[in-house]
Amino acid sequence: MKKIIEVNNVSYHYDKEHALENIHFQVAKGSFTGLIGPNGSGKSTMLKLILGVLKKQQGSISLFGEKQADFKDWVKIGFVSQKSNAFNSAFPATVKEVVASGLTKKKGLFKTLNNKDKEDIDYALKRVEMTDYLHRNIGELSGGQQQRVFIARALVSRPELLILDEPTVGVDVENVKAFYELLAELNRTEEMTLLLVTHDLMAVNTYVNHVISINKRIIFDGSAHEYQHYLADRELEILAEQRRREDACLDCDASPV
């Protein structure tokens, strides 16, 4: 299976504190991978390293089989962040303008849209079912609708890999399920590789097929099915430890003074 992302023994620290230690994992072509972990686990740092925002201090990262340092074809990667709502009522922009801004990796800024660009915009909006909102101001849309537009912005360059960083932050509960179902459909119908950075266990349990759990180091790396068994085993271990502590307390209470 072709590897889209390969991370080998990557470590990173801020000052003297380790953010990541000897991280290693692979993301296969066509997979829907969930990168999970608690706050402060290093998820955001790992994402910044993959995207080249931070420079690794140890180990290696490859994208589409190339060393990250040599990788130039960033048009292959679409990105949706939890802060995509930078386009809002304070900076008015139409849905069309927001989606078109995703073409800058191909065209640069302030380039006139040609027919192919317009076809790509139409394709992206159709994929997220937002074609009727083409000329609406982005600030007028709900949180869920805005995130659909930002996915369209990431899709407009027709990437092979879509990376999403906590994409449902600020999205109402009613729209979260529809949002993840859209991602699953992209993965299924277009064989798009997805890397979802999240702490949403519902999404992990329901939609992804590959789970990577980190807490400054690799905690788990395997299929979603294997992860369910891992969680069940951990729960049993926690219950057993709780019982041992309760028994120890009972023994203490029963001891003569």
Swiss-Prot record:
Domain ABC transporter: residue ranges: 5-241
One of the record's GO molecular function terms: ATP hydrolysis activity
InterPro entries: AAA+_ATPase, ABC_transporter-like_ATP-bd, ABC_transporter-like_CS, Metal_Ion_Import_ABC, P-loop_NTPase
A single GO cellular-component term on record: ATP-binding cassette (ABC) transporter complex
Signal peptide: none
Ranges that cross the membrane: none
Source taxon at top rank: Bacteria
Keyword Aminoacyl-tRNA synthetase carried by entry: no
Entry-linked Pfam families: ABC_tran (PF00005)
Protein keywords: ATP-binding, Nucleotide-binding, Transport, Zinc
Binding site for ATP: G37, P38, N39, G40, S41, G42, K43, S44
Family to which the UniProt record says this protein belongs: Belongs to the ABC transporter superfamily.
Role: Involved in a zinc uptake transport system.
Name of the protein: Zinc uptake system ATP-binding protein ZurA
Protein's gene: zurA
